[in-house]
Curated annotation (Swiss-Prot):
Signal peptide residue numbers: none
Localization terms from the record: Nucleus
Protein name, as recorded: Single-minded homolog 1
Organism of origin: Pan troglodytes
Presence of the UniProt keyword Transcription in the record: yes
Main location: nucleus
Domain PAS: 77-147, 218-288
Domain PAC: 292-335
Recorded coiled-coil stretches: none
Length: 766
């Protein structure tokens, strides 16, 4: 009985072993390996193989359940796959969501010393550093997509560094730390959707595995790796401060080794790549080795080269402490964007093409003079552009700009903010230029002052007395130079500041003040015509003068001026009109030819150079046709003209002269009288001898708005404009001559016509 049971057990074990051997033969492994496998290894490898067939149903040979068909193409494919693994300089592995290694290529033994059979089916956590377990868990964790029903299968990219166990001999293992070797793993996480029976569109997603390739990093010793022509090596401290560089860096980047020593690697890397470099630096300090992502290393003469670095921490042989960082760098491209300067070292290393001042000013040409010499001579050296500059842009105007209705813009008339190639740089041809723009015309940029014809045609730049040379140079830098023969559209009046009390929104502004139609025209001398500003009697309509100018409105201005600008210009126009009107009333009718000289005391033209005589004009009202004939006369350069005959020949006064440093100041005794948008007009039945009183309607709904605004150019607030004491003092301050100011305020009988009439401000300049 015992003999029978022993024989039965032996027979059962033999059958079991034969079944295991038959199962081992089915594994995609060489027969030399499968014949030596034990039962546990056969079960472990078989389960791993079955999991792999789920992940890749047709990726490992023929489809499941189909008979194998051998063909010459299949044999070639298998041989090619084995050769690819040999030339890969790494190994392929597939990890299940639970960390089990479903597949790993036999080339892993070359890098780790562990066989394929030993690793397959076992947990990867058994072969990686304990400090990397959390990172591996995070790599294997997937997140469900936002639109799950649209995606059947997707992949998530993964790139990470693992310290894997290495049992190779020390001379063949390369750099190991505590028996672990740093492996750079890159691949993807495969996610698949499994449909449910109840709802085929709302299936659950399952992580089916990680497919990755592992590369061992190069060794740290330079003698163990051959440096090719596109490679260079550097040694740095633990904070990436460069200590030593290979001489090949000069050929690849243009920098000499001594130019880079004592500076960190971050100093010479493109700003957009510093974050990736910082992450790699952190991994290097934690794990001892790292492969950086592709980053841009700045070249000496502008541009950059793409580089990838393999860095390793070298330990002290005596203390076993980290000593320094050794990096082998692969330069992958030639210099890109030559001439594009992104660092001050690049600019100082090469001759700057532009400077803020003339070429006689010394510039920084030597990068190795040190910080002390640069600080000591900072006053005499000009700073250059920290950004630059593509060589594809030229100084000529664009084709579309030649026929532009604006007559050329400063962005196309001047050079583009890009540097030219060294062969095209105009530094030797122009003695004065700018860091961002090259100017063909170096004439005056004092736009607030009149530009005579001689100032436009001469090469030298004239600084007027009220102009500061530094501000003029700043104007050339920001605005460009007005081109001779072309009408520039910029000027100092385009930058008038808004007061804090002014409405912030456009709607509030339009609702709080009447419409003012502003018309602009450019003289041949290169500045705006101030006298072309007219005031509209009511919102939405233009005055008599505004209709004449409507056809050429904004022909030269690139943008519509703001309403505060038009208000200031309209106010100045009416100041001039009222002053000349007072002078006409004061002077006898036979002495109208002398108004040009007598009107200067009331003029706002505080210029300190020769200028055309001011004009005497009559304020145009709605009932202008019924006034006396003498009120229609304008005196201009000794000629008696009608106000409609020479509207295009006004002599403007630039607003910048009012606030210029050397201009005459308006004394505190100067008083302003304004009647802005009141219910008043010039009565056709009013004579010069009548003296009507000011109606209380003058203090209408607009008083609250006017009280909030101050004219920054004169320093007076509008809240004092309607003071009776102010009006009385004004009449007493005009050289003792008596005349009644209220004679100019004609009340309109119809109070329903709101915002109709002209705005008048009277000032007495000392």
């Amino acid at each position: 009985m015992k003999e029978k049971s022993k024989n039965a057990a032996r027979t059962r074990r033999e059958k079991e072993n034969s079944e295991f051997y038959e199962l081992a033969k089915l594994l995609p492994l060489p027969s030399a390996i499968t014949s030596q496998l034990d039962k546990a290894s056969i079960i472990r490898l078989t389960t791993s193989y079955l999991k792999m067939r789920v992940v890749f149903p047709e990726g490992l040979g023929e489809a499941w359940g189909h008979s194998s068909r051998t063909s010459p193409l299949d044999n070639v494919g298998r041989e090619l796959g084995s050769h690819l693994l040999q030339t890969l300089d790494g190994f392929i592995f597939v990890v299940a969501p639970d960390g089990k290694i479903m597949y790993i290529s036999e080339t892993a033994s070359v890098h780790l010393g562990l066989s394929q059979v030993e690793l397959t089916g076992n947990s990867i956590y058994e072969y990686i550093h304990p400090a990397d377990h959390d990172e591996m868990t995070a790599v294997l964790t997937a997140h469900q997509p936002y639109h799950s029903h649209f995606v059947q299968e997707y992949e998530i990219e993964r790139s990470f560094f693992l310290r894997m166990k290495c049992v190779l001999a020390k001379r063949n293992a390369g750099l190991t730390c505590g028996g672990y070797k740093v492996i750079h793993c890159s691949g993807y996480l495969k996610i698949r959707q499994y449909s449910l029976d109840m709802s085929p569109f709302d299936g659950c997603y399952q992580n089916v595995g990680l497919v990755a390739v592992g590369h061992s990093l190069p060794p740290s010793a330079v003698t163990e790796i051959k440096l090719h022509s596109n490679m260079f090596m550097f040694r740095a401290s633990l904070d990436m401060k460069l200590i030593f560089l290979d001489s090949r860096v000069a050929e690849l980047t243009g920098y000499e080794p001594q130019d880079l020593i004592e500076k960190t690697l971050y100093h010479h890397v493109h700003g957009c790549d510093t974050f990736h470099l910082r992450c790699a630096h952190h991994l290097l300090l934690v794990k001892g080795q790292v492969t950086t992502k592709y980053y841009r290393f700045l070249a000496k003469h502008g541009g950059w080269v793409w580089v990838q670095s393999y860095a390793t921490i070298v330990h002290n042989s005596r203390s076993s402490r980290p000593h320094c960082i050794v990096s082998v760098n692969y330069v992958l491209t030639d210099t890109e964007y030559k001439g594009l300067q992104l660092s001050l070292d690049q600019i100082s290393a090469s001759k700057p093409a532009f400077s803020y001042t003339s070429s006689s000013t010394p510039t920084m040409t030597d990068n190795r003079k040190g910080a002390k010499s640069r600080l000591s001579s900072s006053k005499s050296k000009s700073r250059t552009s920290p950004y630059p500059q593509y060589s594809g842009f030229h100084t000529e105007r664009s084709e579309s700009d030649h026929d532009s209705q604006w007559g050329g813009s400063p962005l196309t008339d001047t050079a583009s903010p890009q540097l030219l190639d060294p062969a095209d740089r105009p530094g030797s041809q122009h003695d004065a230029s700018c860091a961002y723009r090259q100017f063909s015309d170096r004439s005056s940029l004092c736009y607030g002052f009149a530009l005579d014809h001689s100032r436009l045609v001469e090469e030298r730049h004239f600084h007027t007395q009220a102009c500061e040379g530094g501000r003029c140079e700043a104007g050339r830098y920001f605005l460009g130079t007005p081109q001779a023969g072309r009408e520039p559209w910029w000027g100092s009046r385009a930058a008038l500041p808004l007061t804090k009390a002014s409405p912030e929104s456009r709607e509030a502004y339009e609702n709080s003040m009447p419409h003012i139609a502003s018309v602009h025209r450019i003289h041949g001398r290169g500045h705006w015509d101030e006298d072309s500003v007219v005031s509209s009697p009511d919102p939405g309509s233009a005055s008599e003068s505004g209709d004449r100018y409507r056809t050429e409105q904004y022909q030269s201005s690139p943008h519509e001026p703001s309403k505060i600008e038009t208000l200031i210009r309209a106010t100045q126009q009416m100041i001039k009109e009222e002053e000349n009107r007072l002078q006409l009333r004061k002077a006898p009718s036979d002495q109208l030819a002398s108004i040009n000289g007598a009107g200067k005391k009331h003029s706002l033209c505080f210029a300190n150079y020769q200028q055309p005589p001011p004009t005497g004009e009559i304020c145009h009202g709605s009932a202008l046709a019924n006034t006396s004939p003498c009120d229609h006369i304008q005196q201009r350069e000794g000629k008696m003209l009608s106000p409609r005959e020479n509207d295009y020949d006004n002599s403007p006064t630039a607003l910048s002269r009012i606030s210029s440093p050397n201009s005459d100041r308006i004394s505190k005794s100067s008083l302003i009288l304004a009647k802005d948008y009141l219910h008043s007009d010039i009565s056709p039945h009013q004579t010069a001898g009548d003296h009507p009183t000011v109606s209380p309607n003058c203090f209408g709904s607009h008083r609250q708005y006017l009280d909030k605004h101050a004219y920054t150019l004169t320093g007076y607030a509008l809240e004092h404009l309607y003071d009776s004491e102010t009006i009385r003092n004004y009449s007493l301050g005009c050289n003792g001559s008596h005349f009644d100011v209220t004679s100019h305020l004609r009340m309109q009988p119809d109070p329903a016509q709101g915002h109709k009439g002209t705005s008048v401000i009277i000032t007495n300049g000392s």
